[in-house]
Amino acid sequence: MRKVQEIEDLLAPVAAREKIEIVDVQYSKKAGDWVARIFIDKDSGVTISDCENISCIFGAFLDESDILKDSYVLEISSPGFKRVLKSEKSFRRFIGSKTRIRTFKPINNQRNFLGTLLNFDDGRIKINDVTNGVVEIEFSDIRKANIEADI
């Protein structure tokens, strides 16, 4: 997890300069190779051209830094249908969306919530859960959250 944070910290100023948001970073081994996956977004949406451009820019910064000592594959992508929600900004942006939230500890004997994201205020998320109705969850209690696509 520390490596992911190092990657985010290195690339955050570059992303800001390029007017994009880093939505999520993953760094893991796949079929014996290290893979750095970086999900990006911007207000007007991400194109293939954006991904190509950011791949070149991020790749150069990662190669110049000493963060990734082993060889790696760099993948740049849009967040997709099941976009991860990690920041307060992302929760606020997707108020009204169907959301899946998993918590570190049970809230009302429940750790998994699915429903409409109603609000984010004072470090608390309010969701209209399909099972228990309106539930408030501390931002710090969220293990994982993502948009749930209606397909």
From Swiss-Prot:
Q: Where in the cell is it found?
A: Cytoplasm
Would the keyword Cytoplasm be found if you checked this record's keyword annotation? yes
CDD domains listed in its UniProt record: YlxS_C
The alphabetical list of record keywords is: Cytoplasm, Ribosome biogenesis
Q: Which InterPro entries match?
A: Ribosome_maturation_RimP, RimP_C, RimP_C_sf, RimP_N, RimP_N_sf
Tell me which Gene Ontology terms the entry assigns under biological process. ribosomal small subunit assembly; translation
Q: Name one GO cellular component term.
A: cytosol
| Database matches in Pfam families | DUF150_C, RimP_N
Q: Which family does it belong to?
A: Belongs to the RimP family.
What does this protein do, in the record's words? Required for maturation of 30S ribosomal subunits.
Q: What is this protein called?
A: Ribosome maturation factor RimP
Q: Which gene encodes it?
A: rimP
